Amino acid sequence: MYKRQAFLLASSIAFYIFIYTVWLKRRTHHNIVIGGAAGAFPPVIGWSCVTGDISVLPLMLFLIIFVWTPPHFWALAMYKDVEYSKVNIPMLPVVHGRKVAKIQSFIYSLVLCLVSVAPFFIGLTGKVYLFSSLFLNSIFIFYSFKLLNSDKNENDIFASRLFKFSILYLYLIFMFFILDKIFQI
């Protein structure tokens, strides 16, 4: 009955263990970008378990997490770069420097805004979600912009703020998905 879901779950776990942890994590600074797929699978698996199929909505949730992952982890890596360097994990700020990581984080923040408002424009959500998403994304982009323009002394402050807000962002964006379905405005 749940063969597809079991396959998705097993694939996600295998991807995380073998592709991300064994192969990517210590070999490339692209580890977070590619490995982000493993962290983005749970909504697809959960949706499939409840509904029995995979539709556009869980794929949008997948995309939100997938695009959210790089700026979230690069922000952490920017203020923990010494620790990542000591244990030989080639995070983007360690390999290519903070400036490159700041630029990439800002670009991903802009893409995240586009991806996260897309559900409204393709008819999956209503105005509650749209306005909430725009508000949350404006804060995410603000912190990312402040980090992008921070000097050496401010870097850790804004990297930490972006990292912490990104956690709240993901929780709230999904909460507003739910509230939007409840209130359907």
Task: State where each predicted segment sits.
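Transmembrane helix-loop junctions and nearby membrane-interface residues
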Residues: 24, 80, 117-124, 141-151, ...
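Solvent-exposed interhelical
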Residues: 69-117, 123
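Hydrophobic residues within alpha-helical transmembrane segments
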Residues: 11, 15, 37, 63, ...
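Helical transmembrane-bundle signal
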Residues: 43, 65-69, 109-112, 116-119, ...
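Intramembrane alpha-helical segments
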Residues: 3-50
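Helix-coil boundary and interhelical linker segments in multi-pass alpha-helical membrane proteins
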Residues: 3-7, 42-65, 115-129, 177-185
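Interfacial loop-to-transmembrane junctions
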Residues: 141-172
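Transmembrane alpha-helical segments that form the membrane-embedded catalytic/substrate-channel core
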Residues: 14-21, 63-81, 113, 136-147
